[in-house]
Structures are given as C-alpha cells and as structure tokens.
C-alpha cells in the first residue's frame, strides 16, 4: 500500500517590526546589517567628475549650511549603490538634454525638430562613453579658462623636508606624499586633513621579511610612492633598497619586498590590478603582486640607474633611465621597444598619454612628445622652463644693458624638467622644474605637437605632479632641493604639497 503524501504546511512569514535597539530578543547585529551595507557602500559608488574639487568650489561659493549638509547626508545614507548610479545617470541625462535645448534656443533653428534634438543628445552621450573607455581622447585643454590672479598654489600639507613623491587615489579624494625624512602622509584633497604613517620597529620590519640594514641604522628616506587602484595598498620605496607595502585603511606596515640591490627610485601599480612595478638604481625593474605578496618577474634592459616609470596596464610599462633611453615594456610578450633621447638630452621623467603616445622631460629643459610608431620624438619643446638670472641664488647683476632679463643656460639644475604628468586619456599635461613655474600643455591630436597653455607660479623644485580624472586641479610636491640629490637649493621655497584649481568651461557651452 502506497504511503499517503504529507501535507505541506506553510508557515506564516514573520512581519517586520520596528523595535528599538534594546527591545525584544532580536539580535542587533542582524537588525543593523542593511543599514551598514547601505552606508558602507558609499565609498564604492560612482562619483561625478566634478566631485574632485568640491572643496575648492564650495569655498568659492561661500560653503553650505550645516542643516543642508545633515539633510543631504541622511538622504545619501538611505540610498543604495544602484540607486545612486541611477540618480547620477539621470542627472547627467538631464544636464545634457537641457544643454541641447538651450543650444537650439540660442541658434533659433526652427527646422531642427525634436528628433534632431534626441540625436544630438545621443551623440553627446556616446562621446562621453568613448572618452570614459579610452577609445576617444577627452578634450580638456580648450576648456581651460585663464587662471584667476587670486588662485595660485595653496599649501595643502606641510613637510619638514623636501617632498619627493605625490600620488592620488583613483577617485582623487585622497592623496599621499612622502619626503626625504621618511615621513609618509595620507591627506584629504578637499579638507587637507592629514594623518601620518608610523614606521614600525626594526624587529617588526625584519619579521615582515626586510633584510637587516647595511649600516648601523636603517635609512627611511622615501623616493617613490604608488597606490593601488582599489585604494587598499600603498607602496613606498627609498634608500633602504626595500619596497614597503602599507594597508591604507589602518596605515600599518604589511610587508617588505627585498630583491633590489640599489635604492628604489620609482614605483607604479597597474591601473586595474594589484600588480606592482619597481625601478631601482641597480638597473633592474621588478614585478610584484601586492595581493599575494609575491615576486613575479624581473626585467632587464637599462644600462644605468632607472629614474621614473609609468604603468598603463598590467601589460604595458614605460621607464626612463640615466642611460638616455626610454623602454616600453610588453610584459606578456617579454619584449620591449627602445627609444633614444635626442643628442643633447638625458631623460628625467615620463608619463603615458594613452596607449599610443607618451611624454618625457629632460635635463636640458625640453619636453618631448613620443609616438609608439616612431623611435624619435614627434615634437620637442625646447627650453620649456627657462631660468632667468634673478631666479638663481648664486648669481647677481642679472640684467643686461638694455634691461632685458637674460635666460640662464638650460643646463642649470633649476631648468631641468623634474616632473611631468598627464590626465590619462586626455589632451591635458603639465610639467614642472625649479624655475618658478608649473606649465600646462595641450597635446594636439595625431601627434601633431604640443601647445603651451598657461604658466602657474610656484617656487622650489617641483619633484612630483598629479592631475585627477576630472582635470579640475593639479597637485605638486615641492621642495627646496631636488628629489634625488642636493645639487641645487631654492631657499624661498616651502617644503610641502600644494594644490592649484583649474577652472574649466562647462561642457554645455561647447555642445
């Protein structure tokens, strides 16, 4: 006889009750979980491009009231990551639609109907998508407005010794800087609030796989910094021949990578990976994995000290060295392209513009534009940072008979292009030296050349530059001395990190 089937009894679902934190026998951990998820997800949300300089814009507008800020924060806490993305997308669509409508009204084009307006909006959104994906170069240079005389560089973080490295997080909300005295600082771009990283004891460093120092005391002088794309890891390197890995959230030392026999002069993380590249005075370039804390590969090719590097992806790396060469490394293929500097120059710094073009700065004061299709520069700006005699502390009588200031020879240490940076995927770049200015450049399409934009006044050796994704400000690491030596000194300079706003014409005006 077949067994009788059991009846399935459906239990009623418990109703959600609004209890206090101490009421009932409900576990408060599960009660607060959704709220914590919503609040914690805010750091991972997509932010608008204008958020990079909210602090500077707020200061110019007079700030926002405390009540308004509290209401806005309460609204954001109730908003999930998906809802925020949808809200930002709707705001962008509304902004583009309104701009297209104003364009039609200004042109008084009665023949352009609603369908033509929709096509215009679709073209604008498609252009935005191509720019974000890197398939089209973002045009920022023509949107830059004349700098306001009251703008100028403002001190963001002070250091006691010359700053040697400055990097920004991927969302450009946070920055990191290091100086010759070994101080590493983590700071907020908007407020300037800073926190120091504390070096552990020698015993802790040895337990983290650091080799004992060659001298009686370990040198903590930092020459290079790099932050991972996810913002979890900070890497530092310097005279002690180790790459030190730090946890950004806790600011604690995690690991010390050993393998180089010379000072660590440059570091770079892959844009979308945990792979870390390091360059050293021992002429080697090494590849590490910060997530697994392992050594991966070693690249040979330079015949002298490696100075700077820039990683486009985990597959492409750009390096320059004192052997007057630049190498473009193709990591998976284990191959490299060799570029030689002009006869009068020794390359000092480099950066990617996109996957086809890159920039370098030289010790003869020139800025070079390179293409992957040519072994020589496609365009050279000579004497990009001229030095006048009144800027040289060691010289007097700096005026000729006709009263004209005479530029010093570009072989002066104050005219060396010591730092160069570009907003990746755009036509905006910047270079710095010790001649008293940071210069902004426009990169012409199809390797046609470099066009000067503006010169921003700044005293001291510009040892590092960084431009955020929005292109709305520029950060510089400044010191009285150059990054890798003491062959020059600008006594009027202040050691620290400075920031300068870049005012952009609204995109709606160009639609």
Swiss-Prot record:
What Gene3D superfamilies does the entry give?
YVTN repeat-like/Quinoprotein amine dehydrogenase (2.130.10.10)
Q: Which GO terms describe its biological process?
A: rRNA processing
A single GO CC term for this protein reads: nucleolus
Write one Pfam family the protein is assigned to: WD40
Residue ranges of the WD repeats are 158-197, 217-256, 259-298, 301-339, 342-380, 412-451, 457-497
Where is this chain compositionally biased, Acidic residues type? 44-53, 66-80
Query: Where in or outside the cell is it found?
Result: Nucleus, Nucleolus
UniProt KW keywords: Nucleus, Repeat, Ribonucleoprotein, RNA-binding, rRNA processing, WD repeat
- Could you identify this protein by its name? U3 snoRNP-associated protein-like YAOH
Q: Which organism is it from?
A: Oryza sativa subsp. japonica (Rice)
């Amino acid at each position: 006889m077949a067994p009788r089937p059991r009846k399935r009894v459906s239990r009623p679902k418990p109703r959600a009750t609004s209890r206090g934190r101490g009421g009932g026998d409900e576990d408060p951990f599960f009660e607060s979980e959704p709220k914590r998820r919503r609040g914690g997800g805010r750091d991972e949300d997509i932010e608008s491009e204008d958020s990079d300089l909210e602090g500077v814009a707020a200061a110019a507008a007079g700030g926002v009231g405390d009540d308004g800020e509290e209401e806005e924060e309460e609204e954001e806490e109730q908003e999930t990551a998906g809802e925020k993305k949808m809200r930002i997308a709707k705001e962008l669509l509304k902004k583009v639609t309104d701009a297209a409508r104003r364009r039609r009204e200004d042109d008084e084009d009665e023949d352009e109907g609603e369908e033509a307006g929709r096509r215009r909006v679709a073209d604008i959104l498609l252009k935005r998508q191509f720019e974000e994906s890197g398939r089209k170069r973002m045009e920022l240079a023509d949107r830059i407005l004349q700098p306001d005389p009251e703008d100028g560089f403002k001190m963001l973080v002070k250091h006691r010794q010359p700053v040697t490295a400055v990097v920004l997080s991927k969302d450009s909300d946070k920055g990191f800087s290091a100086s010759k005295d070994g101080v590493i600082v983590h700071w907020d771009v908007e407020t300037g609030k800073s926190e120091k990283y504390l070096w552990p004891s020698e015993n802790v460093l040895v337990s983290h796989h650091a080799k004992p120092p060659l001298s009686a005391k370990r040198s903590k002088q930092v020459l290079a910094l790099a932050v991972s794309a996810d913002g979890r890891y900070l890497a530092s390197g310097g005279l002690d021949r180790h790459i030190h890995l730090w946890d950004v959230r806790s600011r604690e030392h995690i690991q010390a990578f050993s393998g180089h026999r010379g000072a660590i002069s440059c570091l770079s993380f892959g844009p979308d990976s945990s792979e870390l590249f390091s360059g050293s005075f021992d002429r080697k370039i090494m590849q590490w994995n910060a997530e697994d804390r392992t050594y991966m590969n070693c690249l040979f090719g330079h015949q002298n000290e490696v100075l700077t590097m820039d990683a486009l992806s985990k597959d492409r790396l750009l390096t320059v060295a004192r052997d007057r060469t630049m190498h473009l490394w193709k990591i998976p293929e284990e191959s490299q392209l060799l570029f030689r500097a002009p006869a009068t120059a020794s390359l000092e710094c480099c950066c990617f513009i996109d996957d086809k073009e890159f920039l370098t700065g030289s010790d003869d004061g020139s800025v070079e534009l390179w293409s992957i299709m040519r072994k020589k520069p496609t365009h050279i700006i000579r004497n990009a940072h001229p030095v006048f005699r009144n800027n040289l502390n060691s010289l007097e009588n700096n005026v000729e008979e006709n009263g004209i200031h005479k530029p010093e020879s570009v072989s002066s240490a104050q005219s060396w292009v010591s730092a160069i940076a570009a907003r990746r995927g755009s036509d905006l770049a910047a270079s710095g030296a010790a001649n008293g200015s940071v210069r902004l450049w426009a990169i012409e399409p199809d390797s046609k050349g470099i066009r000067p934009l503006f010169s921003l006044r700044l005293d001291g050796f510009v040892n590092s530059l960084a431009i955020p994704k929005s292109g709305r400000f520029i950060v510089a690491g400044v010191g009285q001395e150059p990054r890798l030596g003491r062959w020059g000194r600008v006594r009027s300079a202040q050691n620290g990190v400075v920031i300068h706003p870049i005012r952009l014409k609204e995109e709606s005006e160009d639609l």
